[in-house]
Each structure stands twice: as C-alpha cells, then as structure tokens.
C-alpha cells in the first residue's frame, strides 16, 4: 500500500481548539462511517455524523458526545493533551461502547452503551483498573482494544505521553475484563518508544496474515512489522511510513505536530488508508491505493527495478527468488510505502508468486 501525496483535510478547525485525536466508527448503525474527534481546549469529543455515503463520507456540523444524563463527556487536560476516543464492544454484550483515554492523568474510562447501536446511550464513565488500582500510563493515554495474544479475550494496548506503549493483558472474561499490570511492548528487541505522545493501532500492514502495529507520535507515522505469529507477536523496530512526492521520492508523512493516526479503508476500495489528526485541530486523510507495474527492468545481482503508474520515480529491488524477467504488467498490491521489506504479489502468472522487495535508495 502506498500513501497518496499530501493528504486531504476532512474536518479542519475542530470546535474549541486543537490536538485532534480521530476515531472512525459507524456510531449510529446506519452502515456509514462516522467520525469521533477528541479535541482541546474544551476536553470533549466531537461527533461528526456522515451525511454522504460509506465510500464517500461527508461531514458538516458536529455535536459533542454526551452521557445519558445529557452532560458532555469531558476530560480536561493540561498542556497539549486531548481525550482519545476508541469504540468497541468492551463488555461483550454485542453493542458498541466508548473508551476514552485521559490526557491529564493517563487513565482510561469506559462508557457503557445502555441502549442500541442505532441510538447509543452512554452510562457515566468508569475508570479501568489493574487489580484494585486505577489503570494509568502516566499522561496522555491513547487506548486500543485488541486480542493481542490470541487467547479469545480483548486486551488493552495503550500509548502514552512518554512515547512508550503498554500491554495490559485481560486475565478474566470478555464480559468483565480484569487487567494484569502493564508490560512494555517491545520492537527491535527493546522497549518501543516512539518519542512522545504515542498512538498505536493493530493492523496487518504488509498483508502477510500477521498483525502489525501502525503507530504515530510527534515525530512521524510508523510501522512495526510482526515477524513471528499472531499469538506471540515479535515486532521489528519502527520504520517510518512515507508518501511519494513527485521529484522528491519517498517523504515521511507529516501533517503537523502531535500526529494521531487511525488506519481505515476510508473509500471502500479494499486498501487501507490513514486518517490523521494534528495539533491544529485538523483531521487529514491519506489515501492508500493499488497500483499497476508499468515497467520491469532486470538488473544484476538477482535484482529488478520496478516502475509503476503512480510513482515511476521509485525503484524496488527483489531480495529473494529469481529475477522475474518474463513478467509483463504485473499487479502489485498491499505494498507499504515505508519500511525496508515487504511483499508484492504477481497476479498475472498462473500461480501467484511472492517476492520480498526493498526500496533501492
């Protein structure tokens, strides 16, 4: 997957301030993507209902998310934090709930949906705990619920203001999670630290069947590739995700300070895109796209230079298998724009062939 140059603004100028933290979800159960955005200085969560289609979302006005008693969900934050929304069925009752990471103290709050997916009504927030103690990552928590160890129970991954990512294992049930003490996620054999203000999402970025981490921080957007298994992920060191810019090659994605990432297939074309919030309250959309190889040039040393229609100035080199000198117009899919290695699939041959490729600098 390659990310389009530049990015398009989805909802510039969030109400009341900046530090936008986006979450894409079908909030009202109408089959279309909606957008939740945590924002400062108000410390609230804006709900943008989709007035377009699922493949072509359109947003105009917003409302602030409220609990069932009519009060706005509110999480004040000192400095440059904002409430970080995450939507999932947290208690296993088949309905979407809301989790919110608090900027000021690094806690995570659970707002239970007491009504339906078509018309969510949220109970007052309850802080998550580790044993009898309040769960916290210190400051600027950004929760992500996922079954990290594939034991059938949803765990919690959480970014933090210090740039580390913590794994809280669910040791109880899907209906009543109980979390073990935090364990730092490792990448490249050391504790993963993305700089400051880390956000982490789980997605199979390179299409090899293994879940990876797609992350962001103040310094960029990153991919941590899983080289082991889904039940026991072993992550490579973070690699910067870039976008092709004509005349400049691959350039790291930057939307401004305080980048917060959310991967989603925004336009329903089967390729993952990136939605990014920043410090100025703007939410950007970077489109991932399939592309078709336009030219294959065999080179010495079991390598081949590939050129494609959307970015002919980029070269990739085959690192394994024989040089595919007889391929004409192969289709490449799910090729990440960042990182040293990935896979691409030749769909023209009778049998699919897979090659490990590397950006030729």
Predicted regions and their residues:
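Blade-level signature of beta-propeller repeat domains, shared across WD40, Kelch, NHL, RCC1
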Residues: 254-291
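Blade-edge motifs of beta-propeller repeat domains
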Residues: 1-17, 51-80, 114-138, 171-195, ...
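Acidic/hydrophobic-patterned starts of short beta strands in beta-sheet-rich repeat architectures
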Residues: 29-39, 92-102, 150-159, 207-216, ...
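Short, composition-biased motifs enriched in small/polar/acidic residues
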Residues: 290-361
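Loop/turn-rich, solvent-exposed surfaces of beta-rich toroidal or solenoidal domains
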Residues: 201-202, 209-211, 215-225, 230
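Residue-level signature of beta-propeller blades and closely related beta-rich strand-turn architectures
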Residues: 39-41, 51, 102-104, 114, ...
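Beta-propeller blade termini
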Residues: 20-27, 83-90, 141-148, 198-205, ...
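Beta-strand signatures of extracellular beta-sandwich domains
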Residues: 46, 109, 166, 222, ...
């Amino acid at each position: 997957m390659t990310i389009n140059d530049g990015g398009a603004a989805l909802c510039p100028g969030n109400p009341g301030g900046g530090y936008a933290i986006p979450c894409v979800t079908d909030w009202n159960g109408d089959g279309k993507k909606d957008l939740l955005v945590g924002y400062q200085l108000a410390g609230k969560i804006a709900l943008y209902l989709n007035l377009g289609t699922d493949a072509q979302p359109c947003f105009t006005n917003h409302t602030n998310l409220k609990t069932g008693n009519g009060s706005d969900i509110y999480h004040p934050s000192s400095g440059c934090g904002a409430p970080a929304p995450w939507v999932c069925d947290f208690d296993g009752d088949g309905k979407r709930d809301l989790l919110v990471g608090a900027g000021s103290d690094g806690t995570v709050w659970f707002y239970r949906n007491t009504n339906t997916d078509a018309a969510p009504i949220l109970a007052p927030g309850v802080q998550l705990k580790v044993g009898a103690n309040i769960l916290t990552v210190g400051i600027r928590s950004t929760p992500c619920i996922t079954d990290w160890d594939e034991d059938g129970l949803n765990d919690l991954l959480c970014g933090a203001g210090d740039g580390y990512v913590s794994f809280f294992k669910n040791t109880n049930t899907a209906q009543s999670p109980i979390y073990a003490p935090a364990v730092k996620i490792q990448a490249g054999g050391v504790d993963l630290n993305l700089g400051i203000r880390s956000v982490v999402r789980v997605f199979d970025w390179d299409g090899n069947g293994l879940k990876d981490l797609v992350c962001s921080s103040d310094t960029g957007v990153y991919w941590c590739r899983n080289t082991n298994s889904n039940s026991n992920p072993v992550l490579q060191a973070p690699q910067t995700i870039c976008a092709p810019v004509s005349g400049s090659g691959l350039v790291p994605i930057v939307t401004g300070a305080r980048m917060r990432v959310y991967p989603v297939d925004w336009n329903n074309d089967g390729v993952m895109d990136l939605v990014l919030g920043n410090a100025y309250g703007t939410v950007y959309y970077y489109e991932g796209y399939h592309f078709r190889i336009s030219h294959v040039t065999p080179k010495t040393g079991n390598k081949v230079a590939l050129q494609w229609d959307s970015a002919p100035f980029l070269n990739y080199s085959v690192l394994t298998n024989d040089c595919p000198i007889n391929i004409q117009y192969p289709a490449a899919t799910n090729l990440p724009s960042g990182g040293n290695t990935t896979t691409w699939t030749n769909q023209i041959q009778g049998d699919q062939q897979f090659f490990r490729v590397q950006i030729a600098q």
